[in-house]
Amino acid sequence: MRNKILGIALCTTAVLSLNSCGDYLETSSPSTVTAQLATSSVDGCQTTMDGAYESFHVALRDQIFANGLFYTLDAAGSDIERHGGEQNTGRLKAETFYNGGNSEIVSTFTVLQDLGTADDKTAFALLYGIIPTMNILTDGISEEMIEDEKYGESFAEIYGQALCMKATCYRELIKYYGDVMAVFTLNDIPTAFTSRLDIYDKLIADLNVAKELCPELTPLNKTKFTKQYAYALLGRIALEAASYQTYRLDVTDASRLEKHPEYSDINNATYARPTNYKSYYDIAYDALKYVAENPGGAKFDANDYTTFFTQLHGEDGCIADESIFEDENVQGSSTTGNCERPYAIGRPATSSNKFGVCKSYGQARINPAFYYGVFDPKDKRRDISCVVTGSYLKAGTAGIRDDLKEAGYDGKGCCYEVILGFNMKTSGDGAGIACGKFDENRQVKPYTVKQRMSGINSPYLRLSEVYLGLAEAALMKSSPDQSTADTYYNLTHKRAGLGTKSGVTLEDVVDERGFEFAGEGDRRWTLIRTGFIGKKVKAIKELTKKMIDGLKANGYYTFENGNTIGNYIYYKGVDPTAMGMSSRVTAPTPESMLVGGYEPKTDLEATQFPGWRGQHDWNEYKTYQNGKFPNSNIAIKGLFTNITDTPAGYYKKDWGKAIVKQEETNGFYYEDLFKGWDCQSAPIYLVPISQNGLIGGFTNGYGFTSFN
């Protein structure tokens, strides 16, 4: 069987080897001698594969799943998520599709100047640095090695994992750069860009081989590529191949594309999907259905949405049940522990003391109109996804909470909870509503020595994505399967406390995916590839304007779901343990409070609502100032109702009023939201290839400079 599979793979490589790129890749490609040495034994192959995993960890951390391009584009460029500071840097130009493809902004944008990324640190360089190494393995592992009685299974697994690694790298390259160079063997010398449709076809062929060679997923091997990962990646790539993307018309012939009827071409690029898109959905359906029905060591908790995130915050070595692939981090390690995701898009913290979580920047923030007006108040995911408080600790009284200042607190003890006010300070006490899914307070033992070393893993692929991808494919394939779409949509929908639904549509699935992955950076790409980006951006802009106009006119605005945002909210310092709560890190919001416009009736309720916040249970809370540490948490009132009189014992905080102020001062919340884009032009959601990547006669498309 392995012999047959490898034979198919070798034939496929011969047929689908594509003309590829230039000097940049040619000079970084390994030699034939190196390939022979690396694949001369199982140990040599495994060492090469292990090195690729380490390189992929760097790419995930620095560019495609935490920092870099993920931080610039995915984490903050949708109707749900946005950046928290003023639009004064290069990354914010990219967030808005370069002000709708403004020719001056697009043509002058560079990765080095606008994103501060050196040529050798770009996603392009990091991912293309991995691909030639994988070509060593796929070129060097022979049919005879696969069939070896003693070592054949090991060679087969490494071969399959190498195919998965190449496919993963190309998937990310296409997502961020569009049409790129294809290099699938050691003999490929880049001479031209290759249409992403041809690359997708090659990846699909490779993954059909890999899924039969990779080992079965178990609870213990989720940090490596497995059979279930190969199937899920095949489904993910097939979905994207079927989807709307912005294509260079000088690379992909227009006859192969079906243009989106609502979007105009721009900069010799068109927003379209392949004419045979349904065939890709057929492939996605089969692949994702396999994983859904054969999850191996992955397990979906159908009752509790928080299980996955609780497990992510476990001790080193803890892998979430729902994960299919996690990038592992080790707490405190300067190499594997340098995890950027909790820092970049986690719950914000400003701290300068060992008795508090380390600084978390919290660059990705939640659009307030989405939080208030789009999330169903009954949805259990809202308060896990979106958080209105951060952690704060600084010596002295600068920025200290009013109640602590009055109590004479000197700022030298433990972290305390603060409101994330709507100012331009991206930190533990500003820039508005943030993502609450990655919160170092929730770790069993937070790391306090240095920021960015929490050890929290990065969840790259999990079952809920498989389920919702399957629901999408079921609706869009050649012969739609409504029953399967309903079944897998309802697995996540019901878990969120929203019951079940029949006859779901593609837009239902896209929206469900938005709620399921809110604050995780999935939304932007999902809206782009499903064709809903213009509709959803227009809707959130209109809702934001209504909110701001209402706040200006009346001091409050009430949304259709019953939630009200007012000019002010009110807080009070509390000690949860003195109120009978078991922890300072609060539980999910009690279901009885998950209704539109809920107002807490007691201080205890105001501490529990909204849930999933608070502070870590530092032992020092019990000993500081003879056991009289100032109150660590806050009770909140007026978050979803309009209260005009300050409740007894509470302090008033500008809330909606601060949104209006920022809009009047710098246009941040409405005017800058996808500033300049008309929701009708092909979205330029990509970034240019940097100068070194274009050596050899290549040119950027989409209006970007080519350094010529």
Give the positions of each predicted feature.
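Extended, compositionally biased alpha-helical segments that mediate assembly or anchoring
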Residues: 588-708
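Short coil/turn linking the two alpha-helices of tandem helical-hairpin repeats
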Residues: 174-176, 181, 218, 237-249, ...
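Conserved, well-structured interaction surfaces
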Residues: 41-50, 54-60, 64, 89-177, ...
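C-terminal motif of bacterial Sec signal peptides marking the signal peptidase cleavage site
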Residues: 17-20
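Bacterial N-terminal signal peptides that target proteins for export
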Residues: 1-8
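An aromatic- and glycine-enriched ligand-binding surface/loop that stacks and positions planar moieties
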Residues: 22-105, 208-209, 228-231, 236-415, ...
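Extended glycan-interaction surfaces of carbohydrate-active proteins
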Residues: 204-207, 213, 403-454, 526, ...
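Flexible, polar/acidic helix-loop-strand segments at domain edges
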Residues: 98, 105-110, 374-462, 695-708
